[in-house]
């Protein structure tokens, strides 16, 4: 029976290897050139997450389904003794120590030491004596065990996403002690079952526990992928986070490379000139995200095509823009544009006329856009009129930070060039003072006002994906020529793991 079980386990491993080979991803000769997003987790982060390993192992033990264990043996004077261990359940599980090591180009080695567990169930046994005397008994049992567990997790690419293979799993038993109910059974019976049940039990425990651990590792990998996929999706706009190359395991970090192409209706996105190189990321922080300039450009294009780059300003907000200073030029501009009408009866509409262009530089994120501004007045009881229409090419450099769970965008430089300028009260356009005031106003308060609308919108979007649940420490957003890096440390939110276990198990 054990030989047959070993053969089945061996065949299962062979089939698993064939499945992995069949599901392996194919990549081009230059995978870095098509890499839009890179995720790097360093060893300190792996050590932090390893502290949660105990909960995953406990879940594996408790969720494992143990089959009934049956066997028989011929005994002198007793005849054939048959037994069944049924309704096996785990209780009182404790883990003394868990260690993790990253084995370069191989696996994540997790060594779990001194796992103490009690397996409880019902033992039914019977034997036919030499004088045809048949006796059958049923008694509750408890098995006290002390186990070391070694799991070697390999990271693979399956169906263009990261998959975890934890099939390389070993159990070492330091103790396996059988207790029968109240220890009232004869000592020879206890010794008998301890001797020839233990080997079978070890085999079954290893098979079922390792199977459950491997399943949980795969479910966890899928869960992480789904969370990441949801994080980069907002309504019709999303990112394709398919792998651009096989995931890496290095001595000090784990790393995955993703395409990051924008998904939006019929929008066609192609990346072939990424500047990523592993040397661009260090190992001093827990987590790193490398993002190509191309990704931000494509996201801005999708937002434009989706009609999101539109803003209406009215009432007190509009008044604050036009009265940010009290000068003769300001008073003249307000009089010419609004003609004595109230700000409450006026609306300024701002929108992009063409696809924005984004470039990443050491100074920050440079956004260049052709923008239209239209001020409409709705006098009570009269026909609405367009008081001002202008088009300008605006280039603004923005520096970003993440502080107290909020995204902060700070404009540090801007350039404004008027392309079209039509003021109803000055059709000739000869009054340069109005144009000069508007240019100053747009630079001083107009651009900050637009950015102040973007900040909470993006913060709210990220929080809706659960970012605020993480305790992020000292995050930095660093821009370089054609790419940016987000680097941070973090504390793991325990409730997220519990939520995962509740939903999946």
Swiss-Prot record:
Q: Which GO terms describe its cellular component?
A: extracellular space; high-density lipoprotein particle
Q: Does the keyword Glycoprotein apply?
A: yes
Q: Which reaction does it catalyse?
A: cholesteryl (9Z-octadecenoate)(in) = cholesteryl (9Z-octadecenoate)(out); 1,2,3-tri-(9Z-octadecenoyl)-glycerol(in) = 1,2,3-tri-(9Z-octadecenoyl)-glycerol(out); cholesteryl (9Z,12Z)-octadecadienoate(in) = cholesteryl (9Z,12Z)-octadecadienoate(out)
Which cysteines link up through disulfide bonds? 169-210
Q: Which organism is it from?
A: Gallus gallus (Chicken)
Superkingdom is: Eukaryota
* InterPro entries found in the cross-reference section: Bactericidal_perm-incr_a/b_dom, Cholesteryl_ester_transfer, Lipid-bd_serum_glycop_C, Lipid-bd_serum_glycop_N
The similarity annotation says: Belongs to the BPI/LBP/Plunc superfamily. BPI/LBP family.
Q: Which residues form the signal peptide?
A: 1-24
What does the record give as the function of this protein?
A: Involved in the transfer of neutral lipids, including cholesteryl ester and triglyceride, among lipoprotein particles. Allows the net movement of cholesteryl ester from high density lipoproteins/HDL to triglyceride-rich very low density lipoproteins/VLDL, and the equimolar transport of triglyceride from VLDL to HDL. Regulates the reverse cholesterol transport, by which excess cholesterol is removed from peripheral tissues and returned to the liver for elimination.
Keyword Chaperone tagged: no
Pfam families reported for this sequence: LBP_BPI_CETP, LBP_BPI_CETP_C
Q: Where is this protein found?
A: Secreted
Q: What is the tissue localization of expression for this protein?
A: Highly expressed in liver brain, heart, and spleen. Secreted in plasma.
Designated name of the protein: Cholesteryl ester transfer protein
CDD domains from the UniProt entry: BPI1 (cd00025)
Q: What induces it?
A: Expression increases following dietary supplementation with cholesterol. Expression decreases following dietary supplementation with estradiol.
Recite the UniProt keywords alphabetically: Cholesterol metabolism, Disulfide bond, Glycoprotein, Lipid metabolism, Lipid transport, Secreted, Signal, Steroid metabolism, Sterol metabolism, Transport
